[in-house]
Amino acid sequence: MIRRRPEKYIDVTLFVRMIFLTLVLVLSTLTAPAQQTSSNAQPSPSPDSSTAKQPDPRDPVERSDEFKSKLTFGIYFIPGERAYDLNLRHQFGQWTAWIAGFYDPKSNKLLRVGAQYDYKKGWLHLVPTLEVSTTRAMSGSLYSELGSGKTYAIAGIARTNLRPFFDLFWDPGDSVQLGIGHKISNYDRIQGYTIFDVRLHTEQQNTHVLWRHKLNANNGITLDAVFKSGHGDSGKFIRTAGIGVYYDREKWFWKLYFDPHVNFADHTMVRAGIGLKF
């Protein structure tokens, strides 16, 4: 979300250099040195004396979630303005970390870093997340899925320090989340949940209905319908709806969202993005 308040931002040139240097450092750590081949290597065992590796029966798009790194570039359009966001994230076992830069030529410029931990045991799935930015903004959340079968409950809570912030979720930041999900197959699933404000007394709530579906072996799609209600900054009560599309390939993706009254403001935002998985 974007909340505009007077802040001292970093210089644009320094902002660009920080992003570039960070990308170089992160990408360099992902490249492992080639292993040397021993001159005294023993002959490989025959097929009769070893178990051959079984081929993965899943389709390429079903394996796409297993890539450890993701680089996303987004452009956000509102009337008379355009903003840009670059996000690099990498998974380290159960931990995921990211660094991102947001640039609005007319106002906001900031960097943000974050991390989350993915814990699964039996019927319990917990994902705590923490993110901080160069505007001294902080955001923390705890997401959970409860259930051992195909159908599960969704519950979560999020909190910020109310400083100027920008994130990629576009829902109330100081909120509680409640919902339900159902796994149709290894890839397909449907979810419905509501995220509602519990701190600022705005009565803001966003209800999402998500449907993820495999089109064929190499393509998948997620549709995200959102229904909004609540008071905006002006006090006006808003009721509206938006839609998003996420198109998934094995090693890349694109997404497009139409978001009227973004963050319960008076204007509409269109968000477009493209990314790589590696």
Q: Model features per residue range: what roles?
A:
Residues K70-E81, G173-Q177, T202-T207:
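Short, charge-rich amphipathic segments
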Residues Q35-L110, A272-I274:
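Outer-membrane beta-barrel initiation region
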Residues D59-E62, Y84-G93, I99, K109-G122, ...:
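Feature captures outer-membrane beta-barrel proteins of Gram-negative bacteria and organelles
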Residues I78-G80, S107, T134-R136, W170-P172, ...:
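Short sequence motifs at beta-strands and strand-loop junctions characteristic
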Residues M1-E66, A265, K277-F278:
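Cleavable N-terminal export/targeting peptides
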Residues I10-V12, A41, S49, P57-P60, ...:
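Short linear motifs in intrinsically disordered/low-complexity regions
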Residues D224-S229, D233-G244:
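An anionic, turn-rich surface loop/hairpin at beta-sheet edges
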Residues F67-F77, Q94-P105, L111-A115, W123-T134, ...:
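Transmembrane beta-strand segments that form the barrel wall of outer-membrane beta-barrel proteins
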